[in-house]
Amino acid sequence: MAKQGFSYYKAETDRFQDIKIKRLKKRYHCTGYAVYQYVLNEIYRVRGYFLQFTEDHLFDVSEYWDIDEEEVTAIIGYCAEIGLFNAQLWQEKGVLTGRSIQARYIDICKVCKKAAVIEEGLRLVPAEQVAPAPPPLPSLFPGEEFPAMRIVPGRMAAK
């Protein structure tokens, strides 16, 4: 399978002037900003435009910054509340993405001369900016489903 994410992404020099970043820093100090940047890095590294946040991701962030998992969850919830991540996708699907994340993904794809494909149920940018999704691959085991675990705020659930 081809790599979906990126090895690098651009960071705007005026990001510290963003009111959302200021609110995050005021509430959670440097820890909040560190968690946000870690998750943002994972979004671009793994899939390019979203992250299905799992218990493993929660552990990784917590372990990397040496903070409680509950605090990580609270910080991510606050990031969704203030609009750094899409609140609806976070609450309903445990997915971390946002309009600005997807716009940056599209920009990076253009520079890399790569088709920008965003799943319909996750797309927050206008449809004309993204390439049509390729048809799904046939199942190796027809009729069998293997549910993936994901985090839905407040509980674990099968996908």
Predicted features by range, described:
Residues M1-K10, L58-F59, W65-K159:
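Winged-helix/helix-turn-helix nucleic-acid-interaction surface
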Residues R27-G32, T54-L58, R104-D107:
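Short, low-complexity, polar/charged sequence segments that are solvent-exposed and flexible
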Residues H29-Y33, F50-L51, E69-T73:
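Alpha-helix N-cap/helix-initiation sites
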Residues R47-E63:
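Short acidic, hydrophobic short linear motifs in intrinsically disordered regions
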Residues M1-R47:
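Short recognition helix of helix-turn-helix/winged-helix DNA-binding domains
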